[in-house]
């Protein structure tokens, strides 16, 4: 039962030399919020984006995880030169790009998003956003007294700050595509369209995050930031994600 599981969990944590929460807080990330310059967003509140052009997402696609769908391990584009399955990887990528072109040409998938930028304050591991409290657990592993035990709440001011959040989908319309392939008994294309929609959703998240940083919030210019550097997250700000689901908004 859950009580025994909970006891076992905390006993295991104790054996792993975890800190108690008060001790971990003494090692939190410290920022001087009295001198830190907080930039107010240009757009405050919620905004909905409907039918974002898929063609504008193509350059933002990170193809690396695409190959994991097919259980091919390796980094993109190096995987295309893999001695064991490089040719297979190339064929998969060619098929993916061909299907992606058809999807864009025929408007078979729709990309929608909603995002918001709201006032926020933090205390310990909690962030309060317009009266709603969000908890961001702190790292408890004892990494040494000179190491930081982070909580995402550490990066929100204890005074007045701002926080952004968003959800995207690039999967609206996928049901009809899958249904068509099911009638054709084409399992390969079913897996392929799901993998493409997954990559488009991630690309949309990358693109939207950039739009928020540069346009809607406006705290970053990124005039010379190339796509490859963007995918490596070489920009100001972070985008912690709870997961990637193709949901309808």
Which role fits each region the language model picked out?
Residues 211-223:
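Short acidic alpha-helical/loop segments enriched in Asp/Glu that coordinate divalent cations
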Residues 1-191, 195, 216:
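Active-site loops and adjacent core secondary-structure elements that bind or stabilize anionic groups
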Residues 247-249:
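Conserved small/polar residues in nucleotide/adenosyl-binding loops
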């Amino acid at each position: 039962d859950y009580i025994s599981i909970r006891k076992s969990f905390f006993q295991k944590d104790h054996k792993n030399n975890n800190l108690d929460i008060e001790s971990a807080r003494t090692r939190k990330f410290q920022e001087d919020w009295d001198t830190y310059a907080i930039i107010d967003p240009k757009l405050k509140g919620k905004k909905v984006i409907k039918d974002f052009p898929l063609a504008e997402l193509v350059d933002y696609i990170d193809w690396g995880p695409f190959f994991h769908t097919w259980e091919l391990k390796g980094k993109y584009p190096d995987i295309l030169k893999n001695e064991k399955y490089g040719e297979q990887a190339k064929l998969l990528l060619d098929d993916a790009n061909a299907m992606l072109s058809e999807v864009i040409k025929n408007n078979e998938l729709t990309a929608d998003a909603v995002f918001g930028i709201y006032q926020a304050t933090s205390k310990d591991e909690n962030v309060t956003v317009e009266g709603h409290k969000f908890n961001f657990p702190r790292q408890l592993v004892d990494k040494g007294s000179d190491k930081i035990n982070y909580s995402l709440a550490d990066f929100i001011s204890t005074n007045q700050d701002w926080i952004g959040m968003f959800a995207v989908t690039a999967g609206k319309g996928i049901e009809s595509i899958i249904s068509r392939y099911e009638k054709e008994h084409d399992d390969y294309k079913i897996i392929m369209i799901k993998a493409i929609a997954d990559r488009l959703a991630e690309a949309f998240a990358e693109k939207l995050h950039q739009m928020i940083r540069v346009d809607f919030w406006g705290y970053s210019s990124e005039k010379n930031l190339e796509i490859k550097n963007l995918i490596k997250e070489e920009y100001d700000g972070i985008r912690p994600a709870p997961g990637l689901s193709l949901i309808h908004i």
